[in-house]
A protein has these predicted regions:
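Unchanged
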Residues: 1-172
């Protein structure tokens, strides 16, 4: 695939207080031997994305330990790899990421140094299976600047998630 992958795995979920006190949400165990970030990593690996960056921040130690061996996802290639980034403390910036856009901005050099024409951004704390090749084909066919993968949410769940309003052509 002609894209790099970015997995956002730095957030703190206040609603999961007890579970997230000692580890990042993306490092939460699922079915015993998996972590929630494994789903995003597997989706990227199965879509043949060769270069993946994981932006970490909150309670990242156990997540970094889990990511320390990229052999499970086959990212250890000569032209690719698995990279982890934490907020950079400099004389000009002594803050954690101030949100998703700031995490992207603080790691802009990684994006600029990549030669792939597309970027796939995924959450590290969602459990799903997705072929990003099909998403990229759709993105190119629609000549879109940005493509967002979303699902219908109804009832009480609406307040728990970000919401999009689309027209009949699926334009946001």
């Amino acid at each position: 695939m002609r894209a790099i992958g970015i997995i956002l795995a730095g957030g703190n979920n206040h609603k999961m207080r007890e579970l997230s006190q000692k580890r990042a949400i993306a490092a939460m165990p699922i079915a015993g031997s998996y972590r929630s970030i494994d789903f995003a990593l597997s989706n990227m690996s199965n879509s043949h994305i060769q270069k993946v960056a994981v932006f970490t921040q909150y309670n990242a130690r156990s997540l970094n330990e889990h990511l320390s061996s990229s052999k499970w996802w086959d990212f250890g290639r000569k032209q690719g790899g698995l990279y982890t980034f934490t907020p950079t403390i400099t004389p000009d910036n002594s803050f954690w990421y101030q949100g998703t856009a700031d995490a992207m901005y603080q790691n802009l050099n990684f994006l600029k140094s990549s030669h792939e024409p597309y970027v796939v951004i995924a959450s590290g704390d969602c459990v799903y299976k997705l072929n990003y090749n099909k998403v990229l084909e759709y993105h190119i066919a629609k000549r879109a600047d940005i493509t967002v993968v979303c699902t219908d949410v109804h009832g009480e769940d609406v307040t728990r998630f970000g919401c999009l309003k689309m027209n009949e052509d699926c334009r946001i």
